[in-house]
Amino acid sequence: MNRLGTAAGAVLALVALSATGACTNSGEPPSMAPTSTSVTPSMAPTSTSVTPSTAPTSTVPPSTTSGEVPDTVLAATRAAVHSVRGLDCRKAQVGTTFLIAPDLLVTSAHVVAGIEVPILSVGTGEVSSRVVAFDPVSDLAILRTAEELGEPLAMGEATAGTAVALVAYDSDGMPVERHLTVRQAIRATGEDIYGEPGSGRDALLLDGSVAYGNSGGPIVDGSGTVVGVVFANTRGGEGTSFAVQVGEVHVLLAEVGSSPVPPTECR
């Protein structure tokens, strides 16, 4: 078991949360149900150290630090959140993505690594997208769709103790919401999504677990403002998870061009 520490230099084993499994001809996301055709997701840990961070992520003020995110906020957020999948690699990849502009969405880089045309589930249909920015160190990717999908979510910052919620999809493509709390802002350093040395990312340490398929999902505060993007759990089920701070999203947005990025490697 890995024990989580918040002191500088504490080493954590993180588990990426996109669901992966053997590809099938149906193109459906892998199921986590215990059936003869179910697949087991790959959970390659990365060695990561964390240090407290006070770097601001936005000028949007944080929400109240008490209570839970209201159901009305969760419902409004849900309209901008979609499941995403791809079958280009040896394993199916399933995660969550959300709108930051009518035709731009954010997800985790490990969800779409090696995927040329990520497929979004939007309502009862499907929408193709292309990867227009990709950073294996911050574990973020930005997708563009040919059509506008709706109203984007605002982004801002959170402080320790803020009540937040994850709005995402599970590995079966079913909607989920989880109430969490921001423990502290950290600097997570270590390997990138490919296991190579990286400079790290500004992240949030969260009290509460997340699950397979949740990667790329937005962490929202009581006003519906996105304060982080979920990317990992601690190995061992200790009730701690991690989200990339939105300041990293703003950095990646500056790299978005009119054309898709060159093909990325599968993990």
List the model feature ranges, each with a label.
Residues S31-T64:
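Extracellular mucin-like PTS domains
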Residues G21-S26:
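Bacterial signal peptide processing site
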Residues G67-D71, A80-P102, S108, E126-S128, ...:
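A conserved glycine-rich beta-strand in the N-terminal activation segment of trypsin-fold
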Residues R85-L87, S121, V167-Y169, V220, ...:
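A generic structural motif
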